[in-house]
Amino acid sequence: MSAPFIFKRFSSTIPIHSKPTPSKAHLHFPLPSSSFPKGYVLTGIHAGVKKVAGVPDLAVILSTSSQPTSAAACFTRNAFKAAPVIVSNEILKKNGGYARGVVVNSGCANAVTGKQGMEDAWAMVRETDALLPSKKFEHETLVMSTGVIGQNLPISKIVEGIRSQAESSSTRSLASDFSAWERAAKAFMTTDTFPKLRSRTFTIDGVEYKLAGMDKGAGMIHPDMGPAGTEFKKQLHATLLGCILTDAAVSPRSLQSALTYAVDRSFNSISVDGDMSTNDSIYVLANGAASSSIIDEDATPQAYEAFKQELTTFAADLAKLVVRDGEGATKFVTVTVKGAPSYKDAHSIASRISTSALVKTALYGEDANWGRILAATGSVPLSPTNANTPPPVIDTTKVCVTIVPADGTAPLPVLVNGEPENVDEDRAKEIMTQEDFELLVDLGGMGDGEAQYWTCDFSYEYVRINGDYRS
């Protein structure tokens, strides 16, 4: 056991022992090269954004398909949107949802960097555009950045890095095998402890398609992203970045609809610390390399619905990796709210529970303090069903709270119909000592609304990481 941390409050001195962060090594494993979608080349290199030599900090992703490549995105709603967010949103609006390339740097967020930041983001776009085999629009590259806010990019190093991937360059490393995908995923990382990369194969109407994607994030995680091409007026709360690629052909409008649905049930349903980044972005490219038959929500509704569900499941798998890699996290907790008047209400309550500092510290302490869960639940105002009726009120005599182990053993009710149970504290401790478990809140049949959120605990290691972030 590590040396105790001495916490002094008033006249008392309380020794508190920190716990080791569980290993994440099992979450990073090789994937067969055949599992990746057709028609993409990519790489990750060290351009010099990060201080440590040899650490990847620049990713380049290109679609080489002869078919048009649809693109969709969801961006942060933060008022201080970073330059790459603004630039990429503009490109997607101008192109009507088409793009063939993505360029990503880590180590510098290029956020709150004024005119120079915008010029640097456009420079990254232009240089990557030059690598594309063909173009229909003036600009067909989307850009992402992550790192420290308020610092300018070393743009000359980034430009040199992008140019190193030209066909005529002896240092070109763009490829389509697992190593190339892994290099790109590593270039996304900041405080992440492992590259987050997954793939998925699925079949629609007898045609086999593939999804593959990478994301990054471990801190400054509480996304609230909206669709590309809109002016965001809502302002809410290390950055969440993600890029998903598929060889299906999907119309731009339908791709955006599917992504918006998927993000709400995946990346917008995770929280590490409750802080929304200036750079949060999720991109999807669909290049039609597997089949030229276009999936469209109006023309082929059944195929579209199948694709939407595949994308949602895949996005959730990627999103969960971010929570599992939460800075200093020792727990992965699923928060489920059911019996709410609507999905929106269930999602709002699950979000409040997942971001409560009191709940998250109780998770770290392995303390079944269900009162904190209940307090968070009751603090959320429910939405009125229409403008002429008052919002519904939770019937506290029907609410149930249950701690559900992930190992398949019996759940532990702690509150039943508003009445506290005589909780077996040893059993509660046994469940909460596990790395994975679920908190289930049932509002007692107010409606069919049900939502899940994924969160982690707050540890001393989280404070250490973020106290030292810029040093």
Curated annotation (Swiss-Prot):
Give one GO term, molecular function aspect.
glutamate N-acetyltransferase activity
User: Any idea which residues are catalytic in this one?
Assistant: 239
According to UniProt, where does the site described as Cleavage lie? Answer: 238-239
Q: Pfam families from the entry?
A: ArgJ (PF01960)
- Catalysed reaction(s)? N(2)-acetyl-L-ornithine + L-glutamate = N-acetyl-L-glutamate + L-ornithine; L-glutamate + acetyl-CoA = N-acetyl-L-glutamate + CoA + H(+)
Q: Which residues cross the membrane?
A: none
| UniProt PTM | The alpha and beta chains are autoproteolytically processed from a single precursor protein within the mitochondrion.
Alphabetized, the UniProt keywords read: Acyltransferase, Amino-acid biosynthesis, Arginine biosynthesis, Autocatalytic cleavage, Mitochondrion, Multifunctional enzyme, Transferase
* Any one of the GO CC terms: mitochondrial matrix
Q: Where in the cell is it found?
A: Mitochondrion matrix
According to its UniProt record, this protein's enzyme class is: transferase
Please indicate which residues carry the site annotation Involved in the stabilization of negative charge on the oxyanion by the formation of the oxyanion hole. Answer: 146-147
What processes in GO biological process is this protein linked to?
Answer: L-arginine biosynthetic process; ornithine biosynthetic process
The record describes the protein's role as: Catalyzes two activities which are involved in the cyclic version of arginine biosynthesis: the synthesis of acetylglutamate from glutamate and acetyl-CoA, and of ornithine by transacetylation between acetylornithine and glutamate.
Subunit notes for this chain?
Heterodimer of an alpha and a beta chain.
Full protein name: Arginine biosynthesis bifunctional protein ArgJ, mitochondrial
Taxonomic lineage is: Eukaryota, Fungi, Dikarya, Basidiomycota, Agaricomycotina
